[in-house]
Amino acid sequence: MKNRIIIFIIGLFCLQPVASHADVAGLVPCKNSKEFQRRLDSSVKKLESRLSKYEPNTPPYLALETQINKTKNRFTQYGNAGLLCGTDGLPHLIADGRWSHAGEFMVPGLFFLYIAGWIGWVGRNYVQFASQTDKPTEKEIIIDVPVALSFISTGYIWPFAAFKEFTSGNLIAKEDEITVSPR
């Protein structure tokens, strides 16, 4: 079992994609893109035209000013984040495995997998709990909230708990425990 884990980890490092030095499909940094700047100017211009319809210091006027500042800040952050824009002026996410673009796709992707694993682990534990009660079907339909919250509060350590169960052999069901529907 440990040999498989070691081989898997070594395989992960060996199979990392080699960074290519070619451009990324004609994309340019957003801060250098004329179309990106045109989109910023267009968005701000639309908001300023709406702003001219209101008296200064009125709630709608102040709300639009805030919206203009948020729009400018968003475009500035996109430009400073090193995102690449296409000919349409929109930022494009690069998902090719390069570490220089890890913040665009890999980091949010790993965060998504962590949250999805948390939800799955908590659900798995709750279903296992429900199967050991007097009325398991009822416990699955009508969720026992205090019990579910206790599972949720401990679910954040799911990667370690899953690894522990995997190494102890409790994570994967045995062949004779898996039911097969007759056909």
Swiss-Prot record:
Main location (coarse class): plastid
Domain of life of the organism encoding this protein: Eukaryota
UniProt-annotated location(s): Plastid, Chloroplast thylakoid membrane
Stored Pfam families: PSI_PsaF
GO biological process: photosynthesis
Transmembrane helix recorded as keyword: yes
Region forming the signal peptide: 1-20
Record keywords, A-Z: Chloroplast, Membrane, Photosynthesis, Photosystem I, Plastid, Signal, Thylakoid, Transmembrane, Transmembrane helix
Membrane-spanning parts: 102-122, 141-161
Gene3D superfamilies reported for this sequence: Photosystem I PsaF, reaction centre subunit III
General function of this protein: Probably participates in efficiency of electron transfer from plastocyanin to P700 (or cytochrome c553 in algae and cyanobacteria). This plastocyanin-docking protein contributes to the specific association of plastocyanin to PSI.
PANTHER family linked: PHOTOSYSTEM I REACTION CENTER SUBUNIT III, CHLOROPLASTIC
Protein name as catalogued: Photosystem I reaction center subunit III
Organism of this sequence: Guillardia theta
Gene name linked to the record: psaF
